[in-house]
């Protein structure tokens, strides 16, 4: 089937921001102006289309990335129809995984900032994720109608805090209550939106006299940024002193896609001003799937191969999100990088080595859906009923295999025990937890062998609270939840140059014999686990070496200090012996496990605890109290900045163990006037007194 929209007119964009910057409202306005919604949804009354889970509507925050397709012909109807796939991503730190996954499959992003709050901690996290995947982006400064709004302050923060290179393409007319529109620096005209039509109509006018000087100054910066795109344009600019509109747009597009600049706009989504111009900027400056480099992957032999965004290429796609839908069951969201996917096709999953048959294909609009027959290169859609595909896996042509780069998911830092309230809940709970863990790779479920309890782990208290809540609402499982527990780790600080493990059993008939000698060394943080085979002369036969590795790996989940997972250790197998008759895989696994445990004891084992980056915004009067309290929680205060309009931002690194219940405590310390955000930073060695307490508590 021929394309309705050429690939050059596709835009796959994410809308990303700090919590409360007004991102979901911005998305709602996009859906309204592109004609998808005929009634405006508001986050604060729980009617926003993109926030479709019950918890999201109650809490007024976005938890899962909803994917929506919209169409845009330009604010003045002056463009051919463009197809925009929008992914709305959450702004709460506990849901960073959602942002990470959407960044992996997007071509461009709109970063939304609050004109009052500016660049906040989560803005920095999101910016880092966009850098990691090389996503070109625009900046949209929202809430220009709020008291304390300051477009130019946010411009400065983008430069200093994010090391961005923002290029304003509009500047505000008025501020706070008197914000009425923007000066378009490309056209050098004022844009005033009509309030009666909820911003669907607008007028170009002359730039207000009092803004002419400012507009000329920023126009100059805009033209300079455009001229820097090529020597040819720079010469033209130096000769004529200016550039025309087409030159500017082509140059800004080129530099935005290269990641050199970020066009910057402003408005107030809630008051229906500015989002329309931002949509035009999405078309003008953000890439189509054809503008980005071909996607990298590997063939079956591990050789690098590429696929371009072309319908004629062999099919390849990445599954980037799983979701349970109450009506159609399991949905797998896929980004098609090359070729065409049709319902009824059989495709290949190279990670599992399995074939999958494609059932129905759906184009999603928040939680409404439209059935489609095929998905073309560059598009995003949901597949119904894939049996064995998890987040981050590749789907490809059955005869032309490619494995796309997998996504990286963070390790959980907090755990809780969950127990079903009744026998009936017991059976349903296992199913509910495995379904939720399949959807969310940053959520883990395991059984504690000693206590028999089910332990759930995630990225923060809110993350686990919402998952338990979903278990109740979506699966009808009532559960009791234990106190949050810190996800400690264990490692070693010294080498153990030689440690022996010997497993010998003689009980008549065939016995067991395994004998290994290992060397253990600490790895740098984040090194994980490494196994080296340094056997010479066949003292341990080839076929038993994988069993040694496996024996060590099976020991890693429970360390010798307090039974926490062991990380950052290198084990080298360099000697051993075997018996012609009695040796087998199991005997070598047991010997390796014994040697590793003993080696850990000799190599100065230590307990590691998760450290959190905490940022508190507080009125100045309470700054001293807040800092004192953070220090009493074993926190290291790393700095304090002024907030424009009064108040202080305090940055600190604090152990997670000391942060439980902090929200309540901070409220009482500051009479409810301070707010904070917290995200995982790294693991660090726990002080001896803390480690002793944790070890003693686990030993009870």
Curated annotation (Swiss-Prot):
Q: What is its main location?
A: cytoplasm
* Organism domain of life: Bacteria
Keyword annotations for this protein, in alphabetical order, are: Cytoplasm, Elongation factor, GTP-binding, Nucleotide-binding, Protein biosynthesis
CDD domains, from UniProt?
A: EF-G, EFG_III, EFG_mtEFG1_IV, EFG_mtEFG_C, EFG_mtEFG_II
InterPro entries per the UniProt record, alphabetical? EFG_II, EFG_III, EFG_III/V, EFG_IV, EFG_V, EFG_V-like, EFTu-like_2, G_TR_CS
User: What is one term from the GO cellular component aspect held by the record?
Assistant: cytoplasm
Entry binding sites for GTP: 17-24, 88-92, 142-145
Write out the GO MF terms.
GTP binding; GTPase activity; guanosine tetraphosphate binding; translation elongation factor activity
Instruction: Report the family membership.
Output: Belongs to the TRAFAC class translation factor GTPase superfamily. Classic translation factor GTPase family. EF-G/EF-2 subfamily.
Q: What does this protein do?
A: Catalyzes the GTP-dependent ribosomal translocation step during translation elongation. During this step, the ribosome changes from the pre-translocational (PRE) to the post-translocational (POST) state as the newly formed A-site-bound peptidyl-tRNA and P-site-bound deacylated tRNA move to the P and E sites, respectively. Catalyzes the coordinated movement of the two tRNA molecules, the mRNA and conformational changes in the ribosome.
This chain belongs to the protein called Elongation factor G
Q: Which organism is it from?
A: Bordetella pertussis (strain Tohama I / ATCC BAA-589 / NCTC 13251)
Encoded by which gene? Answer: fusA
